[in-house]
Amino acid sequence: MKKAVMLVSGGADSATVLAMAREIGYEIHSMSFNYGQRNNAELRKVKELIKEYNVKQHKIVDIDLRAFGGSALTDDNIDVPHYHDVNAVPEDVPVTYVPSRNTIFLSYALGYAEVIGAKDIFIGVHTSDSANYPDCRPEYIKSFEKMANLATSIGIQGQKITIHTPLIDMTKEQIIRTGLKLGVDYKNTISCYEPTEDDSSCGNCLACMIRLDAFKKNNIQDPIKYV
């Protein structure tokens, strides 16, 4: 069975990618990060997801991105924006963008993949993300993959490392639809940037707005708790 390293956040996208990778038949080694994020409820959801998908091994890596700040997710001095209409969400890079986060996460995943002998890395970036987040764009992923094959021992030996982005051409609506077909239980996920202490989602941050809109377009109620 082929090994794969998967970046897992505890959100709907991660759950869908987990289901897709399991369907293909990969032995999944997952990795999550405690990076000082405001929405660390996602780490509690991760524990439920890895049980559901029989993950071979899961690692939670501690990184202090609060040392840099620069994002509403890692800096208490920057407020998480809230919206009342999904169509009012701005198209520029939002303050919830964490500088170089995917580069940092993928670098850890790459190192882990080398150690366990995996040549496949999965990340759940998609169309809705790439419109707002520069490190979710297809050209970024291709560039990182090229770097990975130049910078690793297995890469220079001709054993190609592949960064898989199975959601890259999907909208959030399509992701939810795909997950539902695969039997994903979205009750065990959270997307909110600013959940309450009991893990209820706020319902009007960027992540919540996009998620709620996706479930609405699939004519199904989002099963998680909202304030």
UniProtKB/Swiss-Prot annotation:
Gene3D superfamilies: HUPs. GO terms for biological process: queuosine biosynthetic process. The keyword NADP does not apply. Its cofactor is Zn(2+). Zn(2+) binds at C192, C202, C205, C208. It catalyses: 7-carboxy-7-deazaguanine + NH4(+) + ATP = 7-cyano-7-deazaguanine + ADP + phosphate + H2O + H(+). Binds 1 zinc ion per subunit. Disulfide bonds: none annotated. ATP binds at V8, S9, G10, G11, A12, D13, S14, A15, T16, V17, L18. GO terms for molecular function: ATP binding; ligase activity, forming carbon-nitrogen bonds; zinc ion binding. Its EC number is 6.3.4.20. Catalyzes the ATP-dependent conversion of 7-carboxy-7-deazaguanine (CDG) to 7-cyano-7-deazaguanine (preQ(0)). Belongs to the QueC family. This is 7-cyano-7-deazaguanine synthase. It comes from Rickettsia akari (strain Hartford).
